[in-house]
Every structure is written in C-alpha cells, then in structure tokens.
C-alpha cells in the first residue's frame, strides 16, 4: 500500500458521472490512388503487400490439400497433426506486420501461420542482405539453410530468405528436424526469435499474459520495439486476458514510477475478430460486447485507445498501426485494436 497516494474519502464520494469517448469503427476510407498520390506507398510496396497475402493464402491451401487429399501439386504426403488455419485473415496479418521490424515482438494467436509468415516477410524486406545471410547461416548451425540451398536455385538473398522462412515453417509443422525448432513445436508452437516471432499458443487467449510479461521486460530494460499480442474474439471470454489488459495499464506505471519511465506497457492487444470461437458465434450468441473494441472503455480512462478497423483491407490495418505505434513510443500504451476479419475454415 503506497503511502504517497492519498485516497480522499470526501472526493471519492462526490456526485458526478463517468464519461466515455466515441470509439472509432472502420473509419479508414482512402483509395489506393489517394495513398499513392500522398506518397504513403509506392507501387512496389502495394505489390509486395499483395504478394505477402498470396503467400499466406497458398500456404494454408497447401496444408488443407495435404490434410484432406494427401496431395499437393502432385506430391503425395500426409499430415496427421492439428490444423488451425487463418483462411480469410491474410490481409489482417500482413497489415499488422507491415511496419514491424525484428525489434518488435509478436506473440501468436490460435491461428498463427499467417502471422508468422507475415512478420517474417516484413523483416526480410527491411533487413540487409548481410543481416539476412548472417541470420540464416548462424541459425541451427546453418542446417536449415543447407537444406533450402539444395532446391533454391537463386542468387537473390531476399528470395533465398523467403524460401528459408517457408521451408523452416513447413518443416516445423511437419515435425522435421530441419524445422525452426527441430519439429518439436509444430503448428501450434512455431516461432522464430531472430525475426521477433515468439510462440503462438494452443490455449485460447494464452498469449495475453505472456505478451504482457514480455512488454514489462521491454519497459524495465529500455528495449526497443512494441509487443503485439495476437488473440481472437473468443479469447475475450477468458479471465487471464482481462488480467493482462489491466496489468499492462496499471495506474502505478503513471503515478509511482520515476520520471522518464512513466506510462503503460508498450503492448498492442490485437484482436482478430473472426466472429467465431470453435462452434460458437461471438456476435449475437456467446459474447455480450457486440464489438471487441468496446472493452477498452472498461479498462482505462483512455479506453485503451481502442479502435475497430477493417481487417480485410491491409491498408486500413497499416494506417491504424502507424497511429497506435506512435502512442506506444510516447509511453501511452497499452492499445486495443479490434481487427474485423472472418473465419472461412475452422479446423482440418
């Protein structure tokens, strides 16, 4: 109990009202032409965004065909493991990752294949050829890279890095020793730390408290980067998620911490609102919030800077991240982003 914080019994009983601000809902409305004219993107940037989404979709399509037909592009094989796919969520993941670099940390949701690939592709675009080669050559003693070079006929380092990312992820999912973690993590626990990609989680909402701990570590140690906690809309029915949000925004960060270090934790709670949790539809059936962004009003007076954005438009997601990351840099975290997408395929 801090003696420096006085609770005035008269003041806390004064009559009044608790006020709320409007929470923005899908306010982004720029066209591609406008974005190009304003110089926010080049044509090459937009093509790369589309390419990254296409890679994520084809990756999940590959797993689906192998699981259901034991064949992909004429290659016969099987996959007996779990498949929690992110069909339909590609734009949300690519938009999230676009501005992130290797110093930014992401923790995965229940459906993290596209999150992993998007973050990896974003890092590959930003890192130099020298940095990429050093990463690939040093990871697992170069074992994964050696396997990739057997079939990757290219002198383009970034193209080689993309194949390295895809191969390492596939090998991990298929429990192969050349996977990013010798196949011991699999689909539900794949990660690649050199790119700031931390584990996803088989427990619904499980990333929330872990990511919050990482954000506390970042703040305590003056580390660069934002922590992104990816969770689904159904996870908002889990107590640890609320505990994590509250912890990340505790008043003591603003009232008791020393000057220069005050402010909430550098974390963005990214809710992929795909409207389902297993067989339950969150909107209109299993949840009461209607829109996940509403919950920010129950955590902090700033409403966690909550916003609902169109997750089927990667440019809308990028626009939101640009603004929210600026808040984090100014020690105004945490942030709640409600990213509207859709679950096209449940499990395979």
What are the roles of these predicted feature ranges?
Residues 65, 74-267, 277-304:
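Cofactor-binding active-site loop characterized by glycine-rich and histidine/acidic residues
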Residues 2-123:
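N-terminal amphipathic, basic-rich helices that act as targeting or association modules
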Residues 272-275:
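Nucleic-acid-processing active sites and adjacent nucleic-acid-binding tracks
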Residues 45-48, 54, 58, 91, ...:
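Generic recognition of stable, solvent-exposed alpha-helical segments in well-folded globular domains
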Residues 342-344:
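Mobile "lid/hinge" segments at catalytic clefts and subdomain interfaces of large enzymes
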Residues 277, 284, 303-332:
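Conserved phosphate-handling catalytic cores of large alpha/beta enzymes
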Residues 346-348:
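Conserved small/polar residues in nucleotide/adenosyl-binding loops
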């Amino acid at each position: 109990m801090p003696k420096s914080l006085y609770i005035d019994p008269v003041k806390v009983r004064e009559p009044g009202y608790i006020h709320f601000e409007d929470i923005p809902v899908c306010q982004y409305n720029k066209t591609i032409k406008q974005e190009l004219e304003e110089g926010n993107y080049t044509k090459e940037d937009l093509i790369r965004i589309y390419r990254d989404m296409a890679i994520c979709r084809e990756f999940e399509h590959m797993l689906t065909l192998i699981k259901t037909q034991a064949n992909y592009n004429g290659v016969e094989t099987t996959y007996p493991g779990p498949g929690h796919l992110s069909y339909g969520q590609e734009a949300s993941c690519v938009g999230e990752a676009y501005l992130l670099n290797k110093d930014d940390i992401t923790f995965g949701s229940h459906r993290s294949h596209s999150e992993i690939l998007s973050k990896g592709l974003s890092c590959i675009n930003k890192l130099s050829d020298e940095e990429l080669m050093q990463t690939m050559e040093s990871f697992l003693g170069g074992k994964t890279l050696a396997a990739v070079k057997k079939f990757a006929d290219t002198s383009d380092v970034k193209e080689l890095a993309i194949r390295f990312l895809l191969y390492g992820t596939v090998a991990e999912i298929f429990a192969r020793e050349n996977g990013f973690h010798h196949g011991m993590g699999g689909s539900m626990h794949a990660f690649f730390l050199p790119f700031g990609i931390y584990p996803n989680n088989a427990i619904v909402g499980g990333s929330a408290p872990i990511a919050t701990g990482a954000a506390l570590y970042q703040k305590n140690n003056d580390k660069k980067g934002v922590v992104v906690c990816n969770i689904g809309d159904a996870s908002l029915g889990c107590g640890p998620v609320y505990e994590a949000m509250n912890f990340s925004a505790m008043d003591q960060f603003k009232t008791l911490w020393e000057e220069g270090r005050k402010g909430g934790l550098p974390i963005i709670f990214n809710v992929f609102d795909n409207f389902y949790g297993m067989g339950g539809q969150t909107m209109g059936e299993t949840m009461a919030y209607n829109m996940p962004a509403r919950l920010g009003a129950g955590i902090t007076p700033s409403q966690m800077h909550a916003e609902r954005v169109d997750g089927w438009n990667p440019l809308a997601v990028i626009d939101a991240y640009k603004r929210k990351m600026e808040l984090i840099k100014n020690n105004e975290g945490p942030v709640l982003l409600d990213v509207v997408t859709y679950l096209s395929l449940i499990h395979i």
